[in-house]
Design a protein with these regions (language model features):
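Conserved interdomain linker/interface between the two RecA-like ATPase lobes of SF2 helicase motors
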Residues: 241-318
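Conserved pre-motif I regulatory segment
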Residues: 17-55
């Protein structure tokens, strides 16, 4: 990949902040689990060809970040870009990269100033909020990693389409929490999928939840009338949840390259198992517990729920 020529003019210095690592660095690379090794192998096999894309589905906390970092290494990626929905994730990615002994220059494109952020400063990351400076910075670094938020997508597009010195095409673009970009093309974030807007030789999408469902109704509607005795006939009817968005769209997200479910992670001891505690209060318990004739039906039921939660916490030693 050719390096961009030097710019005719440099942006103002306030648009970039420079920092250097201050904390002791790790000396050993992180060990990979079997599922991560399989995920990396599948990802590299598919993305070896340019102009390909694919997605990985793995439970939260199972190491998708490390999987993507190692895959980029095996693919020989030089200009590596990572898109995330939140500022906190930028810091997490930078920390994970340094913990895995990656030493390439890093820059963040967001509202964060790396020099003022303890994690990014410790990682030695630079930062900017200007697409023009990003293009100039990438021209000076033949191997580098760019972290940016979805909200800063326009700055990336600006850098790659600069008439003065366009930024190079990314060898690999990773989209974290990729389910947030699924759905209608009216979302600004869907520009991540468009190679004419954000040029990248390869795209890798990461998620733990490839399907986005409509939030269920968790409470009964308020009422001023008498509350009927709860029976099968009077119990609320819960409609089946509506699927709002899915990543099962190969033209956008590519094929699924690897799956590591929450259940598999629990079985393997990667994640802790959990128990679901459902507090309940019967109508008889409600009548004996609440005797205030002035309280409305909604207030009585709300109070009962509070008591049920306290009871469950006491019984479960929470």
């Amino acid at each position: 990949m050719a390096v961009c020529p030097a710019p005719r003019r440099t942006p103002r210095t306030p648009q970039v902040t420079l920092s250097s690592p201050a904390n002791p660095q790790p000396t050993a690379r992180l060990a990979l689990r079997t599922d991560q090794q399989e995920g990396i192998a599948n990802t590299v096999r598919h993305l070896r060809r340019p102009h390909t894309r694919g997605h990985v589905v793995s439970a939260c906390g199972t190491g998708k970040t490390l999987l993507a970092l190692r895959a980029s290494e095996e693919l020989g990626v030089r200009h590596f870009a990572v898109a995330v929905p939140s500022l906190d994730l930028i810091a997490q990615w930078a920390t994970a990269a340094r913990a895995d002994l990656r030493r390439e220059p890093m820059i963040t494109v967001s509202s964060l100033r790396a020099a003022s952020h303890p994690v990014l400063a410790a990682a030695g990351a630079d930062s900017t909020n200007a697409g023009e400076y990003l293009a100039y910075w990438l021209a000076r670094h033949p191997r580098a990693t760019v972290f940016f938020t979805f909200d800063s997508l326009s700055k990336i597009e600006e850098a790659q389409h600069s008439a003065v010195f366009p930024a190079p095409v990314f060898d690999l673009l990773v989209v974290d929490e990729a389910h947030a970009t699924a759905g209608t093309w009216a979302k600004n974030w869907t520009a991540l999928h468009d190679n004419s807007r954000i040029p990248a030789d390869r795209r890798l999408y990461l998620t733990a939840t490839p399907y986005v469902w409509e939030a269920p109704r968790l409470a009964e509607p308020p009422t001023t009338g008498p509350t009927p005795k709860r029976t099968t006939a009077t119990a609320p009817h819960w409609d089946d949840p509506t699927l709002l968005a899915t990543m099962d769209q190969p033209k956008i997200f590519g094929p699924r390259l690897h799956t590591y479910s929450h259940a598999d992670a629990i079985d393997d001891g990667v994640l802790a198992d959990y128990q679901l505690v459902v507090p309940t209060v019967t109508d008889d318990e409600l009548r004996t517990t609440l005797t205030d004739p002035e309280a409305g039906p909604t207030a009585r039921r709300t109070t009962a729920l509070h008591l049920a939660i306290l009871k469950a916490m006491r019984e479960q030693d929470l």
